[in-house]
UniProtKB/Swiss-Prot annotation:
Alphabetic keyword roster: Meiosis, Repeat, RNA-binding
Domain RRM residues, every copy: 198-271, 283-356
Organism: Arabidopsis thaliana (Mouse-ear cress)
Protein name, entry field: Protein MEI2-like 2
GO biological process: meiotic cell cycle; positive regulation of growth; positive regulation of meiotic nuclear division
Disruption phenotype: Early flowering.
Top-rank lineage group of the source organism: Eukaryota
GO molecular function, one term: RNA binding
PROSITE patterns to which the protein is assigned, alphabetical: RRM (PS50102)
Function summary: Probable RNA-binding protein that plays a role in meiosis and vegetative growth.
Length: 843
């Protein structure tokens, strides 16, 4: 846009080179544009005024640089003199050409206001010459919890001093470089992408938990340094230990522990790059002016008198600096007070507390791997932890990887310690550091419209309803976005991987079609009449008049911060489920997400409700209704095949449809008690796959026998394992309250699976609607390996009605008197002769 303005002003065409940094030519461009607009007497100013912003922290001036899009960064001793400021090719437009009076007008009267606090922080002598300390800078960026389909970094000993980063969007690669005279451990990322820390970020906290309960739960592992509970009502707390081993032990022992019927989700918290004074001490001391003849063993003997030392590190290009990390931050403070300004090896040393995370990846260990393993194990035994006797992570010993120009690691799923440098949210001194172009281009770039997202299993919402706002999973906290370039607001799911990019589609799951996007829409038009009428089904579907109220209390996620998102569009009841957006398609009937069959949606048409303009789902086209005879009270169902655009985004469909607008399916007990909630069909999630239908029925009937009239457990025909969830229809909405209290957050007793059950409303509501869905040949015809097991408990209904309902589609056996049916597909390769054998085989 700037170049266009300048072109208009000067009356000639100007083009920026496609790979040239805009900031490089900005001084000359602005100078010429202002001169053109003001007749040659205008002001000439630089575009680097962002340096003078005191409202934004200069977090990255110590490790990042703005560079051309095709260049790479590297900091080492070959760096040119930083006192010389060179900005791209703009040397020809020197500041000498700027009129002095123009500069006087631009500058404030009081020179102290020019750079408030900036000169004091500008210490070029302390600039690092490697990117080993590059990591997340926000307390909420915990990393971890992800299951990435990429090669583990633990198998590579990578010299982080050779790391080089690019500003090409979110593509990241780092190149091992030979590091002379070092042999030993090279620390890599902690498992699950986390870096060990003394501070634990505990999510999914019940707001009613007392501080004393948290202290009693975490104190057995070590003395607590601080307990931050101000955000407990938003679902998380932060617990900081003095000893890093205590944090490791607490995380290992308490991960997935139940507290007030909530499963704790614990991660390491990365300290901020600009911590407060009380948080500055992270247990690491920096020794300046230490003689090179002083060995690490001598330092270990001297500093070890004040506490247990975790490791001693030295940087390859700064031989006069050493890093000493203590397990306990109090020991580091004691050593700092005792040994600062003391003499070692004939030189007066200076001690300072290292900034959090500074230079902790490159290390020359003072102890062997076995010794560290023994110390950590002994500490776990002392605090009584039942965790495994292994240190937190893989810490290989050996020489670093030799430098190779063609060896690179590409992390398309996000790398927590590398971020793009040329982005809008990185102001400050990063722009004045000189660029070092490199000939290395061995990486696979992704779209430059993507930001680096930790745990970024990102969902793309419909543009008409949510305006590109992505939701996270229930029990999740909106995470920090690093290096984000996209303009859309994003809430990131915690246990996920991959990138998400916004794209425009006509429909998304959860968005109504255009004819429903106006406030006057109150119902579904009938195919036989132009009269609009609401749903009138038993156990009912939400009435159209209740559409607004259905969204009222579902705008936030349980155990997390409110999303503060307001719905401006009314929605129909069939708008897609966060977990089962297609009824059965996402629960395992079609496990091949690259198959277009998984896109097919099925809308159930009820008497008086059929419509040719019903919402067909994500990119689906509607078809004429297919009538079926023999079903009582059901006239037709509507199978919806996939449209052509559904094939294009097969890979995105699972992630995009899984977490969309989960608030609408949240069970609100207050609404049930007040009578505002009339839905009765639930989905039970996280069922162990080895649970059989009889096991599930027995567990439900233990306390809720007679409270439900429909139970369906989808099962894989080949391996006899269920698909991890079931559908249940309660007789009355009031029965949901005790059922929710029993099963939501329940740990399944059998098989020691560790899965925690959760409940939500299903997309298809009502026993009749579920039965009609199963009656549809298209819903099961292509998936012969699956069959549902359905239980009925209607004592007043005749058995012949049930047989009539399913006889045209399913082979039915009635093993008991409570009308518990085991249903098999007719296309099943199993023989259908003996009903009793079929029932035993399917169960």
């Amino acid at each position: 846009m700037v170049s266009s303005i300048i072109a208009v002003a000067e009356g000639k065409k100007m083009e920026l080179e496609p790979n040239k940094s805009l900031s490089a030519d900005m001084p000359s461009l602005l100078s010429r544009s202002s001169e053109a607009f003001n007749g040659g007497t205008g002001y000439r100013s630089s575009s680097d005024l962002s340096m003078f912003s005191s409202s934004l922290p200069t977090l990255f001036h110590e490790k990042l640089n703005m560079t051309d899009s095709d260049s790479w960064l590297s900091f080492d001793e070959s760096s040119p003199n930083l006192n010389k400021l060179v900005i791209g090719n703009s040397e020809k437009d020197s500041l000498e050409d700027v009129e002095p009076d123009a500069l006087e007008i631009l500058l404030p009267e009081d020179e102290n206001e020019l750079l408030p606090g900036l000169i004091d922080e500008l210490n070029f002598t302390g600039l690092p010459d490697e990117l080993d300390d590059l990591e997340e800078c926000d307390v909420f960026c915990t990393g971890g919890g992800m299951e990435l389909d990429v090669e583990s970094q633990d198998n590579h000993a990578v010299d982080a001093s050779g790391m080089q980063i690019s500003d090409r969007g979110a593509a990241n690669a780092f190149v091992p470089r030979k590091r002379p005279n070092t042999a030993g451990r090279v620390s890599v990322e902690h498992p699950n992408g986390e870096h060990p820390s003394r501070t634990l970020f505990v999510r999914n906290i019940n707001s009613s938990v007392e501080d004393s309960e948290l202290s009693a739960l975490f104190e057995p592992f070590g003395e607590i340094r601080s307990l931050y509970t101000a955000c407990k009502s938003r679902g998380f707390v932060m617990i900081s230990y003095y000893d890093i081993r205590a944090a490791h032990a607490a995380m290992r022992a308490l991960q997935n522990t139940l507290l007030r019927k909530r499963t704790l989700d614990i991660h390491f918290s990365i300290p901020k790059e600009n911590p407060s004074e009380k948080d500055m001490n992270q247990g690491t001391l920096v020794i300046f002016n230490v003689d090179t003849t002083v060995s690490n063993d001598e330092l270990l003997q001297l500093f070890g008198a004040y506490g247990e030392i975790r490791e001693i590190r030295e940087t390859p290009n700064r031989r006069f600096h050493r890093f000493i990390e203590y397990y306990d931050v109090r020991d580091a403070e004691t050593a700092l007070k005792a040994l600062n300004r003391s003499e070692i090896g004939g030189k007066c040393i200076k001690l300072e507390l290292s900034r959090p995370g500074g230079a902790r990846r490159l290390s020359v260990p003072s102890q062997s791997q076995d010794l560290e393993r023994t110390e950590v194990t002994n500490f776990y035994n002392q605090v009584g932890s039942h965790v495994a006797n292994s240190p937190p992570g893989n810490w290989p010993i050996g020489s670093p990887v030799k430098g190779s120009p063609s060896h690179a690691f590409t992390r398309p799923h996000g790398l927590g310690m590398v971020r793009p440098v040329n982005s809008d949210n990185m102001p400050g001194l990063a722009s004045i550091l000189p660029a070092h172009p490199s000939s290395f281009h061995g990486f696979s770039p992704v779209s430059n419209d993507q930001g680096l997202l930790n745990h970024s299993n990102q969902t793309i919402l419909n543009k008409g309803l949510m305006h590109n706002i992505s939701y996270g999973q229930p029990h999740s906290l909106p995470e920090h976005i690093t290096g984000g370039i996209s303009n859309s607001m994003r809430f990131i799911a915690p246990h996920s991987s991959g990138f998400g990019t916004s794209s425009d589609h006509r429909y998304r799951w959860g968005s109504p079609p255009q004819h429903m996007n106006y406030p006057g829409y109150t119902g579904v038009s009938s195919s036989s009449s132009s009269t609009e009428r609401p749903f009138t089904v038993r156990h009912g579907f939400p009435f159209a008049e209740r559409q607004a109220s259905l969204l009222g209390k579902y705008q936030h996620h349980v155990g997390s911060a409110p999303s503060s998102i307001h719905f401006n569009t009314q929605m129909n009841c069939y708008t897609g489920s966060p977990e089962i957006p297609l009824g059965f398609s996402d629960m395992g009937i079609n496990r091949n997400y690259n198959s277009a069959h998984g896109k097919a949606n099925l809308g159930v048409s009820l008497p008086g409700n059929s419509s040719e303009q019903d919402f067909t789902g994500f990119g689906m086209s509607s078809m004429p209704t297919v009538p079926f005879g023999g079903s009582r009270g059901l006239q037709s169902v509507r199978p919806e095949p996939f449209a052509e655009q559904g094939r294009i985004h097969n890979h995105e469909s699972h992630n995009q449809n899984q977490f969309i607008d989960g608030g609408r399916y949240h069970i609100d007990l207050d609404r049930i008690a007040s009578g505002d909630e009339i839905r009765t069909t639930l989905i039970i999630k996280n069922i162990p796959n080895k649970y059989t239908y009889k096991m599930l029925v027995a567990e439900i009937d233990e306390k809720h026998k007679g409270d439900y009239d429909f139970l369906c457990l989808p099962t894989d025909f080949k391996n006899k394992c269920n698909m991890g969830h079931a559908f249940i229809n309660m007789v009355s909405p009031l029965h949901i309250v005790p059922f929710q209290q029993t099963f939501n957050g329940k740990i399944w007793e059998k098989f020691n699976s560790g899965k925690v059950a959760s409940l939500a409303y299903a997309e298809i509501q009502g026993k009749s609607a579920l039965a009609s869905y199963m009656q549809t040949p298209s819903s099961m015809k292509e998936q012969k390996q699956l069959f549902p097991e359905v239980s009925y408990h209607d004592d007043g209904q005749d058995a012949n009605d049930h047989e009539q309902l399913f006889s045209s589609i399913w082979n039915i056996t009635a093993p008991d008197s409570d009308w518990s049916y085991t249903m098999d597909l007719i296309e099943n390769p199993r023989e259908n002769g003996n009903s009793k054998n079929a029932a035993e085989e399917s169960s």
